[in-house]
């Protein structure tokens, strides 16, 4: 990929001038002046209807953003991304989570070897294992079928699987799936306290099988299991997803119960691999395959569609417009589905760990904003929590509204109430409420002029708050796969434009190193070589 500082491009300089021209324009006027605005800024693709017309953009804005993508050689970068080039240059690795959902006849090479046949082998193993656990063919050490699955992992080995299993809960089978991630012992013991060791299967997910949190939790769970079963039965109840075969075998896991990972798949993009075994067990392999199919369809859309009609490209460029020109620092993601409760927190890792970088691909400090802060909660809960700040606060917060035309239980009364709020919020954020409208409303309620003058300023909404409306036919495994992949590719586009490496995460290393040092000090009762604040805190903790 070419390393281009975006601020040096012609398009960037023109966008700076363009921003000065339109920064004070109100979107209401944009709509009033163009009756076809919604048509011009809507993309309908398969079961996705994405309206991005409620943004502070014009056709000129879009043209300049597309010019920026061209000047940053986005098309070449996409080819490098899907072609298996080592675009994660700080670790000298390709970034090929897309290969995990590629067609079985695809040819995707890493070090001159097609990786797709190996991916297909692992998928077949996931399928067979899932089917055997779900139908009771594979049993626990006392001959009972499994009833509970516990996934032990952290970061990408947890956030993706837990998000998808909760999002697709409607499609779950009889197995109960639990997740242990935090090294907090209370979290571990609370999860396992009511489980039956005879009918519980544990999945330990760690690429290196050395991650402190995961290994500590796995060891605690094994000790709990061994209070009821002999050591030799560990192999029937513990499965590993890892590359470290020796460490896994030393733990007591049978080699046939080891599922491989690859270093060309980053943790936060790994749910499509055997890391997603818990997903396959929860919803069945056919639904897991549908999830992958949906992601592959979004991959194809991203690769093959012109940038003008390309969902990930358009959403990424609009995000850059706000981040770098309006200086917006955060984006909210609001799914109008309680099933997607964990989706914003999943995106927090995917986006913030990927693009939270301050050094560009040339090794130079950037002099422009990069990664956005991501946050959100499902609607309508979020309306009663933090929408006040979005509507009347001092910060510009672009917001994605994700909704579904059809509910899963087909309760039209509830669905209509939910979606009425979904549409109303984007309209309210667009239009706001003027002082004149407030006065008229209060007069209609028989308020005196004195009362109106006292409170009217507090009831004015400026509006002009940008939103994207992502409306999907129905929440299915396939549509969920498309949605996740949409944001994955948005991350990639932003990283290309910002000239940063999106697929490493060196920022998490220092804290780990210091934690290991402090852990040793708890045993030795020493607090040397710390700042005065940390030293005092450690002494208080150890007292």
UniProtKB/Swiss-Prot annotation:
UniProt subcellular location: Cytoplasm
Q: What EC number(s) would the UniProt record show?
A: 5.3.1.9
The primary location reported for this protein is: cytoplasm
Reactions accelerated catalytically: alpha-D-glucose 6-phosphate = beta-D-fructose 6-phosphate
Q: Which GO terms describe its molecular function?
A: carbohydrate derivative binding; glucose-6-phosphate isomerase activity; monosaccharide binding
* UniProt enzyme class: isomerase
This protein's GO CC annotations: cytosol
Source taxon at top rank? Bacteria
Keyword Transmembrane helix recorded:
no
UniProt pathway: Carbohydrate biosynthesis; gluconeogenesis; Carbohydrate degradation; glycolysis; D-glyceraldehyde 3-phosphate and glycerone phosphate from D-glucose: step 2/4
Concerning CDD domains, the annotation shows: SIS_PGI_1 (cd05015), SIS_PGI_2 (cd05016)
> Which keywords does this Swiss-Prot/TrEMBL entry list?
Cytoplasm, Gluconeogenesis, Glycolysis, Isomerase
Catalytic-site annotation from UniProt: 353, 384, 512
**GO annotation terms (biological process):** gluconeogenesis; glucose 6-phosphate metabolic process; glycolytic process
Q: Which PANTHER family match?
A: GLUCOSE-6-PHOSPHATE ISOMERASE
Entry's family note: Belongs to the GPI family.
Task: Relate the protein's function as given in its record.
Answer: Catalyzes the reversible isomerization of glucose-6-phosphate to fructose-6-phosphate.
Name of the protein described by the UniProt record: Glucose-6-phosphate isomerase
